[in-house]
Amino acid sequence: MAAAAEELTLLEKLLGLRRGNKYSAQGERQIPVLQTNNGPSLTGLATIAAHLVKQANKEHLLGSTAEEKAVVQQWLEYRVTRIDGHSNKDEIRNMLKDLNSYLEDKVYLTGNNFTLADILLYYGLHRFIVDLTFQEKEKYLNVSRWFSHIQHYPGIRQHLSSVVFIKNRLYTNTH
Amino acid sequence: MQRGDRLSGSAEAEGEGRANRFLLHQRLRGGGMRLFVTEGAPGNLPVLAAAGRAGARGELLISTVSPEERVVPFLTRPKLPVLKLDSGHYLFSTSAICRYFFLLCGWEQDDLTNQWLEWEATELQPVLSVALYNLVVQGKKGEDVLSPVRRALIHIDHSLSRRSCPFLAGDSESLADIVLWGALYPLLQDPAYLPDELAALQSWFQTLSVQEPCQQAVESVLKKQGALALRTYLQKQPQPIVPLERPVSNEPEEDELSAHTLSEEEIAMAVTAWEEGLEALPPVRPWQNPVLPVAGERNVLITSALPYVNNVPHLGNIIGCVLSADVFARYSRLRQWNTLYLCGTDEYGTATETKAMEEGLTPQQICDKYHAIHTNIYRWFNISFDFFGRTTTPHQTKITQDIFQRLLSRGFLFKDTVEQLRCERCSRFLADRFVEGVCPFCGYEEARGDQCDKCGKLINAIELKKPQCKICRESPVVKSSQHLFLDLPKLEKRLEEWLGRTLAGSDWTPNARFITRSWLRDGLKPRCITRDLKWGTPVPLEGFQDKVFYVWFDATIGYLSITANYTDQWEKWWKNPEQVELYQFMAKDNVPFHSVVFPCSALGAEDNYTLVSHLIATEYLNYEDGKFSKSRGVGVFGDMAQNTGIPSDIWRFYLLFVRPESQDSSFSWTDLMLKNNSELLNNLGNFVNRAGMFVCKFFGGCVPKMTLTPDDQRLLAHVTLELRQYHQLLEKVRIRDALRCVLTISRHGNQYIQVNEPWKRIKGSEADRHRAGTVTGVAVNMAALLSIMMQPYMPTVSTTIQTQLQLPPAVCAALPTNFPCLLPAGHQIGIVSPLFQKLENDQIEGLRKRFGGGQLEDSLELKAKVSKAEAPAELADPEQIKLLTDAVTKQGSVVRELKAQKADKAQVAAEVAKLLELKQHLALAEGKPLDPPKGKKKK
């Protein structure tokens, strides 16, 4: 199964949706497609994810105020445009640097509330974070703190490997 | 607040919106919400339009900053526009900003709107930024701008027309409309980039463009300069990378199909078709000679653009016409359509005369020599012409003169005195291709005498600025001579009527439509059809005895005369528009002659000619990201491909795999190796070979009994779906896309074998052994089906598989639309052996060096310098001379080094040729006569 479809299945379980949906993948980038019962199909990871959240009656995960809603969608867009597809080393480093700086004063991506943005960025970043060295994890300290927090959030990690972050700093001089 | 509104007498329905807007108003005043913009950023348009739509425009604090300003502290790269909220949060995504304005009004987004916004960010933006960059920064026009975004535009158009709603997400306007409109406006405001056939897109775009918030946004962002207002901003941005061409499953039209989950009926139908077996196959057409149209049948006449005789064709020429047409001809025969495929060499013209002088032969001898070269190349590539003729025949003269007389007697020709360029030094009238100068339309410096390579417009040589004789670089003088003109303006109305009837529902490629439309939009002009030459079709008119027809009047008539040389009943094909479907294949530069000039001649001649029904034009194939160039020894030419040791089927496969179907593509050696090793060797070859090997090894070469499980039935249904799509695509001549279906089926097959592991089961219980038999039987049947589907693409490999599997000839000759069991239990197959060979890195690197790919950048650079130096005004420019002197020195040391290394002779010769060319240019730039090479050496 394509990676995106797998991720959506994880999300379904996390949301407590019982009936597993069937996904197909479209094109070279394997964009997920959901065939809904009562309407046309839905295409795109962020679109389907938001749809599932509504289906599970957990709208608060999409944000509560206008501002929070816009911020959640902004990070979902960031996920599908910046995190997916761009896999050269420099791009990834830039992305982690930006996120690290952003998360400096935040618990979650919207600030103080856990949302779909945290879920999809966690899934999207997992493959990069597992490959980081301890030194890099300390360099992107705020990302590491956020990631470690999210992976311990009940039900989110499932079969994905748990990434180890060491509490005592190993590399004191890195910034 | 609501009460206040109602008291002021507004309509009830508007109450809520107003109240929300009032809230918004308060928000904006209370907080320090600030929008940061920079001049000319494309994102300004949707953001301001959305603000206007949500009634926030007047209240928004806007700061204009420089494009380099990092407004968002945590983003390394500057991003604008940005909205800073009073909470300190930043919205740096254009659609998130728009969304926020809408949310403040209480307007939420549904799934469909979200889907469009996600599509805009992931699919539209990457291609749109390329198109805008090409248009605004690089000053390109036409296809260069349109082709990157065409698929995306078609996707929007189809979605709108399929749902028949006026807006993207339904009956009323949504955020998606504003965001997409804002993104597309700079491009689509120029009608040239909003093709007429996208009617739904057009009407959607116009509906939005007239709305007040949109108009206001346009005014303040584009400032009446159109897309050029974005120039300063876009110039500072990195050049966007063209996203990879996507396979067909990503095509908008196939949305439903790729999302397809199999229904019970589809599975049942696939099983029924399978069980019907060979009985269901269509009867095979008996072979005929000559092939003639038959009433009541589908009669398909296929032509490929006539290659010019004295150029050895390169790979780009081959994929552009003869190979593409060959695939379609082979497919058409597999469908049992009554098919005739013709081509031939185009032999008349100045270039032939000159070549003859050079080689000390007569023009006819030159044509004979090169006609044979062409014939051999196409034979090696396995092109299945029914007839490959030539234009220097009595039939050509007869038919051309007949059309001419008919046009003359109907008043579509007139005489006029023409001012012509004559080179006094060479003492001859200069044919168009021997004049070069500055294009009068776009200012391109190396425009040819008949057409500008940059803007594509046709030029009368005399209109060129700063004309030069290409042979001696002398400035030619203007002399007058009498000529005949085809009165195209008189025929314009008939042409438009015919196009109106023909284009609707036909399979003309979008670029062919675009080019034709742009010709008509500019208005047709009379065209001179005679030339002061000897080597051509004589003009049968008093006072024109020493003139011949110009090739672009009579070359397209070559198709008719070649048919006449094939059969004396040629008129059954060419004067039979009711029964014949004419497919013409060519590269895009040939479109006007086939869509405008020849149809006008034929319509004017009033002799019921068969006119093109489907005009299939390709874009260009580049060589390793540059151009093929015979003079620079760069690229692979038809006669060289044979000496690479790579079989012709592999060349065919790769050229078809990268066929420049909707945009230019590149030939790359590394890619050729990768595609051979991954798609052919590991995917297709591996599957077919394994399927056959299992039959031989485990079942003594005899196809085993099969009992289909539900899994097998689903597989059959999947294969059937791919087969159907293959047919749909090839019927529309989407050759490259259909090839993907073949590869998908073998991927299904590999997976099927991998999951079912027949090599393990054969050692198991009775039931296991039976299962191994079923899996092997189904797999070998898929291999048989694939061999037929591959036939248009790789005819030799196809025959090899069919021999290995001992597929009966009647089965090989027809491709069904369903997947019947082609090899029933008990069928004995032959000896199975591997189909493809691995290409190794060393081998490919060697070829790359041999064909000049490595030196490409160097020579392009030199070319740029040289061409500047060629302009007469700069003859004495010391800087140019210095550049050339440096280039000569540099090239000289390249040659010395190669000689010192005792490098390959051909390689040394190529470098020496370059050196000599450079020296010539230097001499020209210095205004010296050419020294003999030896004298130069001593200097």
Residue ranges of predicted features:
Chain A
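GST-like domain detector, emphasizing the conserved glutathione-binding G-site
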Residues: M1-L109, N113, R127-D131, H175
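C-terminal helix/juxtamembrane-tail motif
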Residues: A3-A4, P154-H175
